[in-house]
């Protein structure tokens, strides 16, 4: 889904730019690189995106996709270097900060990753994505209380962002609040229609929770 949205954004960006042969060529090249990434062909994708940037060094979408290609290829430092340049672009959004934080975290720099997520929230306070990122970092550190607070914040500020409901429900399934787990689980299922693995996980959690409630103590 995110790739579909990005392709639409690329098309819109170029649609409002002056129509030139070079612009059209860049658009085609970026889409070609994305297709290669989806096929797991990171090296040729990186080569194409670097060629675009060689003639258009400020192209946000080319640089973003190059960072993503590096990330998928496991070159997290190079990925972070790309996204560090992008957070100051006018086109930057919460996904830009999310990817920078993720790349830094995967590179082993958790402190900087946390700082990036917080910086992103200052700029995009209604980003469910960034609140979920913070919650997941807290959960990995064993702080389920902070994780829950972050997930609930994500649900509050971004009610259409389904990962907030998913993370909240999954955490509650392992708590002593089964009624809340069922509530957030049902809300997630009502909102999510594409992520089959998460739908299956939440559905199982709901069934197991009902069984535990019905079972004699």
How would you describe each model-predicted region?
Residues 25-27, 60-61, 93-95, 128-129, ...:
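Helix-start (N-cap) detector for alpha-helical repeat units in TPR-like alpha-solenoids
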Residues 38-39, 72-73, 106-109, 140-141, ...:
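Register position in tetratricopeptide repeats
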Residues 51-52, 85-86, 119-120, 153-154, ...:
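Canonical positions in the second alpha-helix
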Residues 55, 89-90, 123-124, 157, ...:
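Structural marker of alpha-solenoid helical repeat scaffolds
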Residues 65-68, 82, 98-99, 133, ...:
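Canonical tetratricopeptide repeat
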């Amino acid at each position: 889904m995110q790739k579909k949205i990005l392709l639409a954004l690329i098309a819109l960006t170029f649609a409002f730019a002056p129509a030139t042969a070079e612009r059209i060529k860049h658009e085609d090249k970026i889409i070609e690189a994305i297709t290669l990434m989806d096929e797991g062909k990171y090296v040729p994708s990186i080569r194409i995106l670097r060629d675009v940037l060689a003639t258009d060094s400020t192209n946000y979408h080319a640089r973003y996709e190059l960072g993503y290609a590096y990330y998928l290829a496991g070159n997290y430092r190079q990925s972070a270097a790309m996204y560090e340049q992008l957070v100051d672009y006018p086109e930057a959004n919460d996904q830009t900060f999310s990817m920078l934080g993720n790349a830094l975290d995967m590179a082993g720099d958790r402190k900087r990753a946390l700082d990036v997520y917080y910086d992103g929230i200052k700029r995009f306070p209604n980003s469910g994505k960034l609140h979920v990122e913070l919650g997941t970092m807290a959960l990995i550190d064993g702080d389920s209380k902070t994780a829950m607070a972050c997930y609930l914040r994500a649900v509050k500020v971004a009610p259409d962002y389904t990962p907030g409901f998913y993370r909240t429900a999954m955490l509650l399934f392992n708590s002593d609040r089964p009624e809340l787990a069922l509530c957030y689980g049902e809300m997630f299922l009502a909102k999510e229609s594409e992520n089959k693995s998460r739908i299956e996980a939440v559905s199982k959690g709901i069934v197991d929770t009902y069984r535990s409630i019905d079972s004699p103590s």
